Amino acid sequence: MLVDLNVPWPQNSYADKVTSQAVNNLIKTLSTLHMLGYTHIAINFTVNHSEKFPNDVKLLNPIDIKRRFGELMDRTGLKLYSRITLIIDDPSKGQSLSKISQAFDIVAALPISEKGLTLSTTNLDIDLLTFQYGSRLPTFLKHKSICSCVNRGVKLEIVYGYALRDVQARRQFVSNVRSVIRSSRSRGIVIGSGAMSPLECRNILGVTSLIKNLGLPSDRCSKAMGDLASLVLLNGRLRNKSHKQTIVTGGGSGNGDDVVNDVQGIDDVQTIKVVKRSMDAEQLGHASKRHKP
């Protein structure tokens, strides 16, 4: 399983219109990632946290994966998911995430101020914490806040697409990635492409060699695009399609699919399926620390 949790959707607000040319470019990017070995990809819709969201839940997600990318999924076997990234500046102007999270598989936060970072690392019910790696970080990243965020299950995202753009973006990317690795102590990191065109796509070997030179061990680089990234998908899907992350509605076909891989069955068939969760050694260590008497 090779996962990319960040392929940008060509729309920055609900008021923008998506052109067929932009969708075709996105399909080419997804096809390129499939050729490079990726099996699970999340399409990322980035919007400001203070923007007015539609009242109708059906209008919250403009991506519409089944209609736009159903043929691509059937032809290639790709598993596509929807993700929303909320740009957080002033927490007082934000809206509740309960309605938003119902429409997307993954919810991420992108703080651009110190207050936004504090809110993202403490109170928000999110799956991912990411940054604008082509710009300066909103504040100095402290071990205490970032590690507490990782300990409650939120993963940190590194977007390598900024390393393939202009000189200023590359310079800032190197500085920001080192800060994220330092503050998180190399824990809870996932890697996404942020690819806006097929030319910005890289395979796992190219990404590993890049991020390893910035301080992340090579074994954690492979986990960042595999096990940990799939855990983000699992947590996000279980938020809406389970009861206490144990029993989910949908599926039930008996073909062995789970809540991550059963992209359409969970939404189409209203039956009951039991999902067994497993924890790796690192997660078990965190759990034992939190439950010490």
UniProtKB/Swiss-Prot annotation:
InterPro entries in the record: Pol/histidinol_Pase-like (IPR016195), RNase_P_p30 (IPR002738)
Gene Ontology MF terms in the entry: ribonuclease P activity; RNA binding
Any Pfam family the entry gives: RNase_P_p30
Keyword Signal: no
Transmembrane feature ranges: none
Keywords, in A-Z order: Hydrolase, Nucleus, rRNA processing, tRNA processing
Protein EC: 3.1.26.5
Functional note: Component of ribonuclease P, a protein complex that generates mature tRNA molecules by cleaving their 5'-ends. Also a component of RNase MRP, which cleaves pre-rRNA sequences.
Extra remark beyond the main annotation: Present with 6300 molecules/cell in log phase SD medium.
Protein known as: Ribonuclease P/MRP protein subunit RPP1
Lineage: Eukaryota, Fungi, Dikarya, Ascomycota, Saccharomycotina
